[in-house]
UniProtKB/Swiss-Prot annotation:
This is Methionyl-tRNA formyltransferase. GO terms for cellular component: cytosol. The gene is fmt. It comes from Histophilus somni (strain 129Pt). The keyword Lipid metabolism does not apply. Attaches a formyl group to the free amino group of methionyl-tRNA(fMet). The formyl group appears to play a dual role in the initiator identity of N-formylmethionyl-tRNA by promoting its recognition by IF2 and preventing the misappropriation of this tRNA by the elongation apparatus. (6S)-5,6,7,8-tetrahydrofolate binds at residues 112-115. It holds the Pfam family Formyl_trans_C. Its EC number is 2.1.2.9.
Length: 317
């Protein structure tokens, strides 16, 4: 088993953790591709990606093309003479010319048990849908969206209190090891490629702020999953009205499900030390930790101590 010469393509912290694992392995990272620096923060100063920061720390050449479709970009990639390209949350489409550049192909690390969730938000959609388990798939890339042949899968449970933040951490802990196992056996074809079953695929649509608004016509169970799935972004929220008639927006960090009461959806049933209880299509959603605009997250009890007028019994949200 000889060391492989690798081009790594990735952008966020999740990708950087895989790059770190490669740097600590027997394999050679020849170069890194990552998205261009982007404005961030109040000052909108350009900020480098987590992958770029790590690569520069280890004196690895960094390339940041806006697209991989240009011929000169593809020629530069080919001149690096790598055995394989490893892609983790890169954010750019790989055209066929790039996919055909490397003798051992392009490997992708995807945060779901394919073909269950293809697309941009597999971690969040697994929680949103109520899946009991998820995992990571290492696949050989093709021109489709997460449709390539699967080489290796590793699983993990989704707990009843799992948020996207905690699940992201779980997957980041198990995925790099799975990637290295595949790379170590790639030349010997130790992992048999498995074609995905199209009938089992779902599209993990990108999250939006609009979707994050709590829809009381859904069930309490669905809403509780949304709250966990949309944490840390875009954060589930709802709007209420104070005694002056001013609209107040609150993000929800934690909630639980209580037995159903036959009241119109969105009706505030109770507001006490246990939480703020709201009727839904099926079951009651008990809001336990919330964040008013401009404030830190707080318990329902603490919020009610100062803002009880925001939550009148019988009020419909």
């Amino acid at each position: 088993m000889k060391p492989l010469n690798i081009i790594f393509a990735g952008t966020p912290d999740f990708a950087a953790q895989h790059l770190q694992a490669l740097l600590q392995s027997q394999h050679n990272v020849l170069a890194v591709y990552t998205q261009p620096d982007k404005p961030a923060g109040r000052g909108q100063t350009l900020r480098a990606s987590a992958v770029k920061i790590l690569a520069e720390k280890h004196h690895i050449p960094v390339y940041q093309p806006k697209s991989l479709r240009k011929v000169e970009v593809q020629e530069n990639l080919s001149k690096l003479n790598a055995d394989v390209m490893v892609v983790v949350a890169y954010g750019l489409i790989l055209p066929l010319a790039v996919l055909q550049t490397f003798p051992l192909g392009c490997l992708n690390v995807h945060g779901s048990l394919l073909p269950r969730w293809r697309g941009a938000a597999p971690i969040q959609r697994a929680i949103w849908a109520g899946d009991k388990k998820t995992g990571v798939t290492i696949m050989q890339m093709n021109e489709g969206l997460d449709t390539g042949d699967m080489l290796h899968k590793v699983c993990c449970d989704i707990t009843p209190t799992e948020t996207s933040t905690s699940l992201y951490t779980k997957l980041a802990n198990i995925a790099p090891k799975a990637l290295l196992e595949v790379l170590d056996g790639l030349e010997q074809s130790l992992f048999k490629a498995e074609v995905q079953d199209e009938s089992l695929s779902n599209y993990a649509e990108k999250l939006s702020k609009e979707e994050a608004k709590l829809d009381w016509s859904l069930s309490a169970e669905q809403l509780e999953r949304c709250i966990r799935a949309f944490n840390p972004w875009p954060m589930s929220y709802f709007v209420t009205q104070d005694s002056q008639g001013t609209l107040q927006t609150l993000k929800v960090y934690q909630a639980s499900v209580l037995p159903h009461q036959d009241k119109p959806c969105g009706t505030i049933l109770a507001a006490d030390k246990r939480g703020i209880q709201v009727a839904t299509a099926n079951g009651v959603l008990n809001l336990e930790q919330l964040q008013p605009a401009g404030k830190k997250p707080m318990s329902a009890r603490d919020l009610l101590n100062s803002r009880a007028d925001w939550f009148k019994i019988g009020q419909v949200l």
